[in-house]
Amino acid sequence: MSRYRGPKLKISRRLGTLPGLTTKKSNKLNRPGKDGNTDIGKKLTEYGVRLEEKQKLKFNYGLTEKQLFRYVKEARRRQGVTGLILLQLLEMRLDTLCFTLGFAKSLAQARQLVNHGHITINKKVVSIPSFQCRLNDIISIKEKSSSKTLVETNIKNNQVREIPTHLRFDTVKLEAIVLDYCDRNDVSLQLDELLVIEHYSRR
């Protein structure tokens, strides 16, 4: 199953605010559907609620179904709180960290920066958006990168958003170091990750 490339506002109207998908807000208050009234009087089943939480995670991080299931399996395999571990795995992706640091306005743009070879880890170019960063990794913009101006502009526009404490960012060098794994409070996406784990419990 391929990654979603359709209208982003339609998804955010249906699922709520998804900071990784888009920062734009729709003028339409109702969920998508005929006259915006398809959900009136309807109550989601337990399965429907779990599915919706899964969809939030999938669309926010720009994942395919196969990718998300793989992250869930890896989170189950590790010791600790499975839901938090799942979020930590997603937040330690290189594209997610670039977005969190303000290098890009969305995860899709962050993914492009990585794909085009503009991001380095420990001074080496890494062009894989799903690359799992580790503690003490140093993330920076490639020297003489054509995207440096774009990144600088995005950082200025993103100054409202605080850099989480598990990252340390040098705005002069455009360089960050991963100090720790994120806490639940560091994840801006509003969802119940336990329901996502439950959704995949029979697989």
UniProtKB/Swiss-Prot annotation:
Single GO MF annotation: structural constituent of ribosome
InterPro entries hit by this protein: Ribosomal_uS4, Ribosomal_uS4_bac-type, Ribosomal_uS4_CS, Ribosomal_uS4_N, S4_RNA-bd, S4_RNA-bd_sf
Signal sequence annotation: none
Residue ranges of domain S4 RNA-binding in the record: 92-164
Cellular component GO terms, alphabetical: chloroplast; small ribosomal subunit
Keywords attached to this entry: Chloroplast, Plastid, Ribonucleoprotein, Ribosomal protein, RNA-binding, rRNA-binding
Location of the region described as Disordered in the Swiss-Prot/TrEMBL record: 17-39
Subcellular location: Plastid, Chloroplast
GO BP terms in the entry: ribosomal small subunit biogenesis; translation
UniProt-listed HAMAP family: Ribosomal_uS4_B
Described purpose of this protein according to its UniProt entry: One of the primary rRNA binding proteins, it binds directly to 16S rRNA where it nucleates assembly of the body of the 30S subunit. With S5 and S12 plays an important role in translational accuracy.
Family of the protein in this entry: Belongs to the universal ribosomal protein uS4 family.
Official protein name in the record: Small ribosomal subunit protein uS4c
Source organism of this protein record: Phaeodactylum tricornutum (strain CCAP 1055/1)
